[in-house]
């Protein structure tokens, strides 16, 4: 998605060898008009897949996932990172390691929101080592639902997340794919959509 790549180049900050800070439009402050376009692009890419639910993980995946769900006219579910006292039964859980935060969290979704009839589109803000997506896949599979695709706003293609997901048989759709950071500059490779 050319507009997203341009925004990353303009407002993204490279931190070290493998971190991209995009807090001015995605991971802290949200540019809703860009998120709306992102939602429309993902929706167009999966319009014939029979998707019934959009699933993400809190927190930065929520904004793009809401707009994807809106564009598809479907519910969006987000996995919670903290146990909530109102979530008391039928909880689906998985362990997820955060590359950026360097911590492992138990994420959960109430089982009543997913079932074996569902066809799921996973949406997340970043794909690095694939652990967030892997955790969501575990939860979705616990419900007996089918994963149709994993939609990623920004993929760090120089890390092994895509390979992990594709080797497991999942379709990955990334809007912006970063080949690497060279001397503090962002280098893109061809995106999926």
UniProtKB/Swiss-Prot annotation:
Name the GO terms of the biological process aspect. Answer: purine ribonucleoside salvage; xanthine metabolic process; XMP salvage
Q: Which Gene3D superfamilies match?
A: 3.40.50.2020
- Single GO cellular component term: cytoplasm
Q: Which reaction does it catalyse?
A: XMP + diphosphate = xanthine + 5-phospho-alpha-D-ribose 1-diphosphate
Could you tell me which CDD domains the record lists for this protein? PRTases_typeI
Superkingdom of the organism of origin: Bacteria
Q: Where does it localize?
A: Cytoplasm
Any idea which positions bind 5-phospho-alpha-D-ribose 1-diphosphate? 128-132
Give the binding site residues for xanthine.
Answer: 20, 27, 156
Instruction: Specify one Pfam family.
Output: Pribosyltran
Top EC class, one word: transferase
Record InterPro entries? PRibTrfase_dom, PRTase-like, Pur/Pyrimidine_PRTase, Xanthine_PRibTrfase
Function recorded in the entry: Converts the preformed base xanthine, a product of nucleic acid breakdown, to xanthosine 5'-monophosphate (XMP), so it can be reused for RNA or DNA synthesis.
Official protein name in the record: Xanthine phosphoribosyltransferase
Please give the organism: Streptococcus sanguinis (strain SK36)
